[in-house]
Amino acid sequence: NGQVVSLVGSKDFFDEEHDGLVNVTIRPRQPGSSFKPIVYTAAFLKGYTPEMTLWDVNTVFKSDPKNYEPKNYDLGEHGPISARMALQGSLNIPAVKMLYLVGVSRVLDFAESLGYSTFGDRSRFGLSLVLGGGEVLLLEHAHAYSAFANQGIQKPLTSILKVEDAKGAVLEEWKESDGKQIVERNAALTISNVLSDNNSRAFVFGLSNSLVLSGRPVAAKTGTTNNYHDAWTLGYTPSLVAGVWVGNNDNAAMKRGADGSIIAAPIWNAFMRRALEKTPVEQFPAPQPTSTNKPFLLGKGVEQIVQIDKVTGKLATEFTPPELVEN
């Protein structure tokens, strides 16, 4: 409904040495991979699907002013992989390819429609945008995710429910609005379906991780910036969104290995468990099945069986003896 039910702007408000007075929820920070769901949702709106195949192989992109060659967090490659698993495994190379397919300008349009106010001069952004190359505010970041949680409808943020005078007379009182359909419903249901699919992230994070709430469906994504300056976790149920940022107010790097899944996700998990412990379990509605006859979008047609000549190792021809032909 847009209500901000809890907000912590710093670890210790009275800690002057570490800028405790600074409210980091409204301070621009790079979001790392927690921005990937924005790009993938823009892709779903364009007609791409979670089942489509992306090639996770080292690739040089020459569309940026400088040749850009993104690397995965583990520096490895996974070959052909579904968009679903690429997002859930937080693979960087497929994410950049998805942004390339959708277009930087289209993604920025979509992000701004979700309420992000920090992008400004668009000429600053290239394909690294999908890896968190643009700064965001934690409050706006969580508000954007709320549209996914609410089947594409986003409602205005509010942190004040009622204003009374000294005698108790109500001067202003919050009334829930209908909100606005920012994201097409099925695209919102699709991104929630992907982000709540723990099995699809297990090949990187394992089945037992801090993005899981036992017995309760939850959609979540972590993020980490270069040199561990920022660690994020954003996640939601159909009725509650929570965002966590961990870092230093002076932008000093944290210790090596301080990524979102290690230091932000446990905080997010603990909050969500406590906040939801006496509430009913909610299910995410299933998205409508993909309607397309294009094998590429269905994750098919990426492999082809060919016949080779066992002697030469080359493609067999009509002149190759049958006993030397191998599939």
Regions from the PLM with identified roles:
Residues 54, 122-123, 159, 230:
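Short loop/turn and capping residues at structural boundaries
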Residues 54-59, 63, 73-116, 123-148, ...:
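Active-site-adjacent helix/loop patches that line small-molecule binding or acyl-intermediate pockets
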Residues 1-29, 33-34, 46-52, 105-113, ...:
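Periplasmic/cell-envelope proteins involved in peptidoglycan metabolism and beta-lactam response
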Residues 26-80, 156-170, 289:
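Short, glycine/proline-biased beta-turn/loop segments that scaffold the active-site neighborhood
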Residues 4-24, 35, 85, 89, ...:
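A penicillin-recognizing enzyme superfamily signal
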Residues 120-123, 210:
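Short helix/loop segment immediately N-terminal to the Walker
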